Amino acid sequence: MASAELDYTIEIPDQPCWSQKNSPSPGGKEAETRQPVVILLGWGGCKDKNLAKYSAIYHKRGCIVIRYTAPWHMVFFSESLGIPSLRVLAQKLLELLFDYEIEKEPLLFHVFSNGGVMLYRYVLELLQTRRFCRLRVVGTIFDSAPGDSNLVGALRALAAILERRAAMLRLLLLVAFALVVVLFHVLLAPITALFHTHFYDRLQDAGSRWPELYLYSRADEVVLARDIERMVEARLARRVLARSVDFVSSAHVSHLRDYPTYYTSLCVDFMRNCVRC
């Protein structure tokens, strides 16, 4: 079972989403409300207690919620080296749906920063395989993502993760990461492209057609607003129902903290619209 090998959290409401009922219809019959199973993919270095605040948005409304954050060393180093180790984690994550027998329920992804996007890109690829092609995704929310090759922003994010490490170790890891990025994605970019497609390019060309909501801020110093706006334009060009909301002043993955009511309403309205589609 994938659940034995993945450090995840699942919240199941007392009344599961597929068993909830609306008030009786005019004909006297109750109509079934199928809330989606929500999968939260955390940012690099994210703690489960951080994701729990977002999880509450959906759990309070009767959704089953799965929370997972990929290990930071895979996010920053494996992907930068072109090693698709996150694909294995993405497969285990999707296997959870079968373990809990919820694979027939609609799915909503809520993806945070590039750390979540790097994992999500493999989810998209796996959804094209025989094992997972019957899973029904109804929508995806992107929070502070995706960003395209912002080395300074990535170093800021990694520095925040390593904040409590020894100063010398922190410096060595930051230098190592910068060298890997420059070597594989600048100097050797044409060679790297032969065996590994950057996650940003993969998302731009993704064949998925469900609605997408991009929540970002021009004040974000980790993922640049222009990268997200360019992604939205690319998705619209592929006839995907993509919408974006600029929070203007909030920092990276801080939109819920700064605008809790507005952020929550955006997520809930998007979820409900996706389920009705």
Swiss-Prot record:
Protein name, UniProt field = Transmembrane protein 53
UniProt feature coiled coil, ranges: none
Positions of transmembrane segments? 171-191
Name a Pfam family for this protein.
DUF829
Similarity remark:
Belongs to the TMEM53 family.
Q: Which biological process annotations from GO are given for this protein?
A: negative regulation of BMP signaling pathway; negative regulation of ossification; negative regulation of osteoblast differentiation; regulation of nucleocytoplasmic transport
Per its UniProt entry, which superkingdom is the organism in? Answer: Eukaryota
Q: Which organism is it from?
A: Homo sapiens (Human)
According to the entry, what is the taxonomic lineage of the organism? Eukaryota, Metazoa, Chordata, Craniata, Vertebrata
